[in-house]
Amino acid sequence: MSEIALEAWGEHEALLLKPPRSPLSIPPPKPRTAVLFPRREGFYTELGGYLPEVRLRFETYGTLSRRRDNAVLVFHALTGSAHLAGTYDEETFRSLSPLEQAFGREGWWDSLVGPGRILDPALYYVVSANHLGSCYGSTGPLSLDPHTGRPYGRDFPPLTIRDLARAQARLLDHLGVEKAIVIGGSLGGMVALEFALMYPERVKKLVVLAAPARHGPWARAFNHLSRQAILQDPEYQKGNPAPKGMALARGIAMMSYRAPEGFEARWGAEPELGETYLDYQGEKFLRRFHAESYLVLSRAMDTHDVGRGRGGVEEALKRLRAIPSLFVGIDTDLLYPAWEVRQAAKAAGARYREIKSPHGHDAFLIETDQVEEILDAFLP
């Protein structure tokens, strides 16, 4: 089977198979990097670690209004990047790291950002930043430790979702944004929840897509297996990259991101091609993500519990009732079942909507028509 056929059922299906919503497009984005916690201050993590300096790579689309009231902060999922929308020009693309180039020229939610789209840069100042701990330009295991001059690697301190939210809040300070609409999916939805609980005065509206209030035993089990695939790779144990482990980790994760309905519809006539698809996704993942960032961020996900130190999940979610909130589940999501998202929405006094799709957890990235319709009824 051709690579394009496999890719068309991969992460960028919406980009490859759906026509553009508008003949217009946004200008080629220019990624920027900001030092948000300089060396004179440093960054102390929730679990007691320390980073001498924290930088975040980010992109913006549109212009902040004079009243500074049109910002939208979008948080990406586990292996996403700051590149939310648009297409890099050749000069920008050549300036990127090999991992960023492997991620691709097109933004990961491109079909929702642009003229006439739900996140129109003519109306909104859209901000998207690569999470702390990732490998796409923000401070992470690949970054140089200022004290040693060498990459942190396996010495990078463990993070929590609250650490990720705190770094994103400092980015808003850097950009002069006091308050924003906050949107996140999957891991990004967890960060959005924590951001709203930590900084409620900074959230105009909250949108949580395909994310739970607590990372429970089912989701943690998938992360555990993916990490074990990496940690048990003989090459990783020798201190080298983990090619076999990373490919297997991705395959395990893809099974949690998809659903039986989608696999049957796509591969039912030739079941062996489903295996080829997983192998392809694993090989592709090797080129575009780093094992240490995968370990750091997946462990951060496993710390996610909005109720920790707040009297339990339900009591914590009650604090969100003053914020207009929308929770979006997916009817075939195996990773974070719809009932889990619906339950969180009820406790938060939030609206609840559900994406109908055979594609499982990844539907929030694929079913952009439904996502746009849902957001259109909620955003101002």
From Swiss-Prot:
GO BP annotation list: homoserine metabolic process; methionine biosynthetic process
Enzyme Commission designation: 2.3.1.31
SUPFAM superfamilies: alpha/beta-Hydrolases
Domain AB hydrolase-1 residues, every copy: 70-366
InterPro entries: AB_hydrolase_1, AB_hydrolase_fold, HAT_MetX-like
GO MF annotation list: homoserine O-acetyltransferase activity
Pathway note: Amino-acid biosynthesis; L-methionine biosynthesis via de novo pathway; O-acetyl-L-homoserine from L-homoserine: step 1/1
S-S pairs: none
The name this protein goes by in its record: Homoserine O-acetyltransferase
UniProt source species: Thermus thermophilus (strain ATCC BAA-163 / DSM 7039 / HB27)
